[in-house]
Swiss-Prot record:
Residues 592-611 have a biased composition (Polar residues). One of its GO terms (cellular component) is cytoskeleton. The keyword Repeat applies. This is FYVE, RhoGEF and PH domain-containing protein 5. Residues 1113-1207, 1363-1461 form the PH domain. Expressed in endothelial cells (at protein level). The keyword Membrane applies. Residues 37-323, 492-512, 592-613, 670-718, 746-777, 851-887 are annotated as: Disordered. It comes from Homo sapiens (Human). Zn(2+) 1 binds at C1248, C1251, C1272, C1275. A zinc finger (FYVE-type) spans 1242-1301.
């Protein structure tokens, strides 16, 4: 893009002493100049207090610069901080030039801009005087960027000298103008539109604070360069310019950079003061902002009539409000100072951290200076109707924006001095000229607001606003930076400053300028222009509501550059489209959590949600995320005319990496949010000097790990960066900023409070704050759990009621560190709706919801690696009938009805066979017995008991026929409950059958003994196909089982009905009817309760077949954690007397069957594992499970139940079957190699379990694949084919090799006992140095050296041997020395054995305990025994031991005391 000739380099600003008043010079482009060529607002705040004027021509100074006096730096403020404004002193030409340079270096600036920007600020305008510390602090970040951008040109550096805030503010303005001069030149964006709103103390400071100043400086630098402006004029350019400018600035000479950095740091630290100073001085500085928030728009116009007139004219004519930006001076450190300045400042500051521009309508906020209320609606310029919240927020944000918004005529440059924050909470992190129709008009309030808020009059912000105006700005290039405010400032929070990063930013810049113009137009329309008035209040506000995440406590708002790129190209595309779906900046809400940041709580515990999208009114931005927000990230409320507007937005979910949500839509919002400072909630509440350090660490990369400020960062490198893609216009353009991509999680057009039709969760994050309500989150219907948000702050709900109803709440962004929650529906506002994809929860599955899996947990947490594949398949295809209904769109109730019908068919078929075959055969046999005349009474009782079978068959035959009819006509009559209610009398047959069940089964067994014919008939039925090879008793139990199945199915059916429907009441009645019968079964049947339990388990475990088996009894269920390496995954176990169901829980409360383990061949043990507390090992022939219980009692209970379930004849064998002794294995008939051994953990062994050699760097461990022992290479030189490996050769120890050879199986020739020389043949083609060394290592040491002699006493007891009194890990130190060493100890035979590890074969030492005394050490200030105890012999201290806890210590003390006496 043609940048035009570079403007002359402005003279370097004279830096005043840190204690001197600092003058912030804002560069006004010719467009911003008033008709008379004077700065509209210069006289007001500029006159107040001393100000330094850069050495420039008068015309240049007058026209191009506004000097804003700043309050002397505080003593605590860094003295090197220079006026950020110095940087801005550069003439428009030079600024344009710088802008170009910055654009070129934009990317670097994006990375280094923070530091460079600082540097550039210092050299900027010597006349400007010392950079304001506040400006410097914010400037540090901004300056780094600017420095990079400006470093290319000395002039740029000089320009940077201006307060970074001013510079940034001006820059966006300039960029806008420059950008406008590009495609937008026709629109004539006016820099005069730039407004510098006052910012309330700290709250406002965050926008204006160093981060803002920096951004402003960066932007200012970028805009300073005409070429930059030109680049910026491109839709993508603004972002790029910003970033590049920042880079250029950071590229400035090191001295400049240092100065800028200092200034930035100072500015960040002192921003409050600067604002304070500027505000106090700027109280008169209406030139910065013509409209005093308290003053009516007219006053503002009057004060800045020239600028305002020019701006109004420009806006009216060209609607080029793009350029107009509010520059928000850095906030003062103290709210007190800020209050002082506030009273005098032309603009009040909104209590909220930042105000937002309502691009749609910006009403004068001048009067709102006094109160937030007035500020809220009028000042924001947002119609209360549209965004009451915005209005409220705006009001809260401060009259600053209101004032800015008020003046229809926005001064070319409105310098808003930030007053010191009365309180940190009071300070507005960002003062956005929401209400600036004219002043913010260029930015359309959106950008102006962002600029003002951010205090970064940066192109980025302009671009953001332009984007808000739908100006096609390169969102990718736009990066929001969070710059830590001065660590010295108690309440300051790092701010996010949008930066233009890529070259595309330059291209978007023009668009941004246009957007700013359009915004200005919109604002102007508010001012009274008919066209704009009509467009001023679109159905949906177009302003962005920015919520800084970094300002979690302080309420700082992070300005975000949001560029909505129009589908088309050209000015029209760049222009803000006044459509309902246009981006809307309701207002900037302080993340401090209280919209009325009036509360003088510097560190309020509450935090405003970064994104207010879809947060129900009752929840005043309730803190949802439990994890502290460690990265600052803006939340954007964006609506666009995207054709995908009504489409679902798909988002991918990644847990630890930077979230990458890529929105597959034509309109993609690109938002580069480069968060320079990430802080936890505790950090947010503390705004101490330590925060300055964050600039270096995170200002550019957003990632503490990225130390380099040079070069381009990759998207993956900056996890906290956010990018919104609205269009693919910037394809192929490199980012100067690293960003992760976050897709909007919310459907833009969906009506308020309606659950989004999302298949994946959206992320709504709030700044860290009180998270007490986050602990208990009920599961809802989403792939990830939806969170029901309890009303946290109902008292303040009213302020946000309309905001949440606003259609503009379309987009929510989240930082990768935020908690990710699917907020698609809020139970607080509407009853929980179970979606089709959620399986109905049965009342019978609820008792088994032992380990509900949080929706936020990644899928791999739900399933182990072994089951991931199967679980994915199950989730996608085999989720029983519940899957089909998802695909077919059927309701869950219909699915349950179909399941009821299918099971009824099988039941009736079974009844038919039972009635015809079994009942008929038994009746005939009984008749024959009657002829014999023996025991007639018993036969009659048996006949009576079986007589209910035909009646039961008829009952269910009728139920089946009617169910088939109902389901065939389901559309016309969706009900099944009345089928049961109509047959209430028929269920009496079931009740009678149940009452006599046990009795007639006993009679049947007795008669079978006396009547061979009856026994033959029963045996014939059991062996028939109809009998299913099951006993008659089992088949008769199925008759009763059906009632329990009804109970389960009807419960699920009831849970999926609307409580208001008649079917709901009928189902309750049917369920009550069935429950009466089942209760009788539980009371009268011996197996009733067990039968019910088995039915419930069968229903709750997916993948499980028929659990009802003869003799099967339920024993125990519970959840244990499966141990796989370092992973712990929940596993729910159902133990029956013959089988163990191994399942894992699912989100709907049910379980998926993983494996069915037979109890008969199971071996259970309680191994002692260092990192696995309360371990329980379950071994079978097919697998080995290592589980961990929550307590010792739970582990022991499971161990006892499993042991009791084992057959008696198997227990003795099982105990020894896994013993390491090969002889015992063979004696018990357990052949080696037939099943996998239990491998001894490597960490449990420090020496060879065969020869006792200590393992070392050269002597490595090897597992024997036959017995599982760990041996050295000298004891495992052989391989043998093992059965369980399908005769594949595997390494075995010498002992197992000898036993396997005895079996007589031939071993392949080459694999027979290998000589040492053949272990590593030298002829191997892979021979190398390592191979050569292995050759020597392979040589058996026994041939060269004597084996270590080990005393027999140390080999008598193995570390894991049986029969020990106690064993476990203890930490030991010798003779009072506090050097603890963890060892394994075993007490056996009154001797204490010491081992390196729990599986060692040879002890390190043994010490008889006879004669020793044990003295526990009591904890300080307590009479209770601590975990430390000492071992004395007479009065000599031998050892001190330290156990894991006091209980363990007590057990060891008792064991040692027992061993110390005979």
């Amino acid at each position: 893009m043609f940048r035009g000739p570079k403007p002359p380099i402005a003279p370097k600003p004279r830096l005043t002493a840190p204690n001197e008043w600092r003058a912030s010079v804002y560069l006004n482009d010719s467009l911003n100049k008033c008709s008379n060529g004077r700065l509209p607002c210069v006289d007001r705040g500029l006159d107040e207090g001393p100000r330094s004027i850069p050495k420039c021509s008068e015309s240049e100074t007058d026209e191009d610069y506004i000097v804003v006096p700043r309050v002397p730096l505080r003593e605590d403020e860094p003295k090197d901080e220079g006026s950020v404004g110095n940087k801005a002193l550069v003439s428009p030409e030079s600024s344009a030039e710088e802008e170009e340079e910055r654009e070129e270096g934009g990317e670097a600036c994006g990375l280094e801009g923070t530091g460079a920007g600082e540097d550039s600020v210092a050299p900027a305008a010597p006349g400007a005087g010392a950079l304001s510390r506040e400006g410097e602090e914010g400037t540090d970040l901004a300056l780094e960027d600017e420095g990079e951008g400006c470093a290319d040109e000395p002039g740029t550096l000089e320009q940077v000298s201006r307060s970074e805030e001013e510079e940034k503010l001006v820059q966006p303005h300039r960029e806008c103008s420059l950008e406008d001069s590009g495609p937008w030149a026709g629109e004539g964006v006016f820099q005069s539109d730039l407004l510098l709103p006052h910012i309330h103390g700290e709250d406002q400071e965050p926008p204006d604070t160093p981060g803002e100043a920096e951004e402003d400086d960066e932007e200012g630098c970028a805009s300073t360069d005409p070429a930059g402006a030109d680049e910026g004029s491109g839709p993508d350019r603004p972002t790029e310019d910003m970033g590049q400018d920042a880079e250029d600035t950071s590229e400035e000479p090191p001295e400049k950079e240092e100065l800028a950095g200092v200034q930035e740091a100072e500015t960040a630290t002192d921003c409050p003061e600067v604002l304070e100073e500027g505000c106090e001085e700027a109280t008169g500085v209406t030139g910065g902002e013509q409209v005093d928030l308290s003053e009516p728009p007219d006053h503002e116009k009057k004060t800045n009539q020239e600028v305002a007139a020019a701006t109004l004219e420009d806006h009216a004519q060209d609607e080029s409000a793009e350029e107009s930006c509010q520059i928000v001076p850095f906030e003062n450190d103290c709210m007190e100072d800020f209050v002082t300045s506030l009273t005098g400042s032309p603009y009040e500051f909104f209590p909220t951290e930042s105000t937002s521009f309502c691009s749609e309508s910006c009403s004068p906020l001048s009067e709102s200076a006094k109160g937030l209320e007035s500020e809220q609606a009028p000042k924001l310029g947002l119609r209360a109707e549209e965004n009451p919240m915005v209005g409220a927020l705006c009001g809260q944000c401060g009259s600053l924006q209101g004032g800015a918004a008020e003046g229809p005529a926005a001064p070319d440059v409105v310098v808003v001095l930030e007053e010191e924050a009365l309180d940190d909470a009071l300070a507005n992190p960002y003062v956005m000229g929401v209400g600036l129709p004219g002043q913010a008009a260029p930015g359309e309030g959106g950008q102006a607001a962002s600029d003002a808020l951010g205090g970064y009059g940066s192109k980025e912000e302009l671009n953001c606003e332009a984007e808000g105006g739908l100006v096609p700005a390169d969102r990718k290039n736009t990066s929001t930076r969070v710059r830590p405010h001065s660590g010295k400032v108690a309440g300051y929070v790092p701010e996010t400053v949008p930066e233009e990063t890529g070259p595309e930013a330059g291209s978007s810049a023009p668009g941004i300028g246009g957007a700013a113009e359009e915004v200005g137009k919109t604002l102007l329309s508010l001012e009274g222009k008919p066209l704009e008035a009509s467009r001023a209040l679109p159905a949906k506000p177009r302003a962005f509501t920015l919520y800084p995440r970094s300002f979690s406590v302080e309420g700082r708002e992070i300005p975000v550059s949001v560029y909505q790129e129009p589908e088309g190209s050209g000015l029209d595309d760049h222009r803000i489209k006044r459509k309902e779906d246009n981006l809307s900046l309701s207002c900037v809400i302080g993340s401090s959590g209280s919209f009325s940041q009036r509360n003088h709580l510097p560190s309020s515990g509450t935090s405003t949600p970064s994104s207010m999208v879809d947060i129900p009114p009752p929840f005043d931005l309730a803190c949802i995320t439990k994890k502290p927000i460690t990265k600052s990230s803006p939340s954007l409320l964006i609506e666009s005319d995207s054709p995908d507007k009504y489409k679902k937005k798909k988002s991918s979910f990644k847990r630890f990496l930077a979230l990458t949500f890529k929105k597959k839509t034509e309109n993609k919002l690109h938002v580069d949010v480069n968060v320079s400072s990430s802080r936890s909630s505790s950090e947010s509440s503390y705004h101490g000097p330590s925060r300055i350090l964050e600039v270096d660490r995170r200002s550019l990369s957003n990632s503490p790990q990225l130390k380099s400020r040079t070069g381009k960062l990759r998207a993956s490198e900056s996890p906290s960066s956010l990018i919104f893609y609205r269009d693919g216009k910037r394809k192929g353009v490199p980012f100067s900023r690293t960003v992760s991509r976050v897709e909007s999680f919310e459907d833009r057009s969906r009506p308020p409070f309606l659950p989004l039709p999302l298949t994946k969760p959206r992320s709504i994050s709030f700044p860290s704050a009180d998270t007490s309500d986050y602990e208990n989150i009920p599961a809802m219907n989403s792939d990830y759990e939806n969170i029901q948000i309890p009303p946290r702050r109902p008292a303040r709900a009213g302020a946000f009621t309309k905001l949440f109803e606003d259609q503009s709440r379309a987009l929510s962004t989240a930082n990768e560190n935020d908690g990710y929650v699917d907020m698609s529906s809020f139970n607080a506002f509407e009853s929980k709706q179970q979606s089709a994809d959620q399986d109905a929860e049965s009342a019978y599955t609820e008792p088994y919801k032992v380990c509900p899996i949080s929706s936020a947990a990644p899928k791999e947490d739900l399933t182990s690696d072994e089951e991931q594949r199967s679980s994915e398949e199950e989730d996608s295809a085999s989720r029983d009938p519940s899957v089909t209904h998802k695909v077919e769109g059927q309701s869950r109730a219909l699915v349950i009805a179909q399941e009821l019908l299918s099971s009824e068919k099988a039941y009736v078929e079974m009844l038919q066979h039972l009635n015809l075959d079994f009942h008929g055969a038994v009746m005939r046999a009984l008749d024959d017995m009657d002829h014999e005349g023996r025991d007639t009474l018993a036969r009659e009782e048996l006949r009576q008991g079986l007589s209910e079978l035909p009646a039961i068959h008829d009952l269910h035959q009728g139920i089946l026929e009617e169910l088939e009819e109902r389901l065939s006509n389901w559309e016309s009559q969706q009900k099944v409950a009345d089928v049961f209610l109509a047959r209430e009398q028929g269920f009496d047959h079931h009740a009678t059958h149940i009452l006599q069940f046990d009795r007639y089964l006993g009679l049947l067994s007795e008669n079978c003994l006396h009547s061979p014919r009856l026994a033959a008939a029963v045996r014939e039925f059991e062996q028939s196909v109809q009998g299913g090879s099951q006993t008659a008793k089992h088949r008769l139990l199925r008759v009763v089982q059906r009632l329990f199945q009804y109970q389960v199915l009807l419960t699920d059916y009831l849970n999926n009905l609307c409580p208001d429907s008649a079917e709901y009441d009928n189902t309750q009645g049917a369920l009550s009817l069935i429950s009466k019968v089942t209760d009788r079964a539980n009371d009268s049947m011996e197996q009733g309760e067990n039968l019910q339990k088995l039915v419930h388990i069968e229903h709750s475990v997916r993948g499980q077949g028929d659990l009802l088996q003869p003799g099967r009894e339920f024993l125990k269920e519970g959840t244990l954690m499966k141990v796989t390496g370092k992973n712990r995954r929940p596993r729910h176990l159902f133990l029956m007397n013959d089988v163990l169901l191994y399942t894992y829980p699912q989100k709907d409360g049910k379980y998926r069957l993983k494996n069915t383990l037979a109890v008969a061949n199971m071996k259970v043990s309680r191994p002692v594992m260092e990192k696995v507390p309360y371990a329980l090992k379950i071994e079978t022939s097919e697998s080995c499970l290592m589980l961990s219980a929550s307590s010792c009692a739970e582990r022991d209970e499971w161990y006892g139940c499993l042991s009791r379930a084992l057959p008696e004849d198997y227990k003795a064998q099982a105990l020894a079957a896994f013993h390491h002794s090969v002889e015992i294995r063979e004696r018990l008939g357990v052949s080696l190699g037939e099943r996998p051994p239990t491998l001894v953990p490597v960490t449990h062994v420090m020496m060879c379990m065969n020869c006792g050699c200590d393992f070392s760097l050269t002597l490595r461990r090897h597992h024997c694949h036959a017995c599982g022992k760990i041996v050295c290479r000298n004891c495992s030189r052989n391989k043998y084919p093992l059965k369980y490996l399908k005769d594949r050769m595997a390494k075995v120890c010498d002992g197992c090799f000898g036993e396997l050879k005895k079996r007589g199986r031939a071993v392949p020739g080459l694999m027979r006992e290998r000589p040492v020389s053949m272990s590593f043949p030298l002829s191997s083609p892979r021979f190398s140095g390592s191979a050569f060394s292995s050759v020597f290592q392979s040589i058996n040491p026994s041939t060269f050296k004597k084996q270590k002699k080990v005393p027999s006493a140390l080999t008598e007891v193995a570390a894991s041997g049986e029969g020990s009194a106690i064993s476990g890990y203890l930490s030991r130190c010798k003779r009072g020395k506090r050097h603890w060493k963890k060892l394994w100890f075993v007490i056996k035979g009154k001797v204490l054995y010491t081992y390196m590890a729990s599986e060692d074969k040879v002890a390190l030492e043994s010490m008889p305990l006879l004669g020793f005394t044990i003295a526990p050490e009591k904890e300080e200030g307590s009479s209770e025994v601590g975990p430390i105890f000492h071992l004395y012999h007479k009065k000599t201290l031998f050892y001190s031991f330290k156990a894991e806890d006091t209980n363990s210590a007590q057990r060891w003390i008792e064991a040692m005391e027992d061993a110390s006496v005979l």
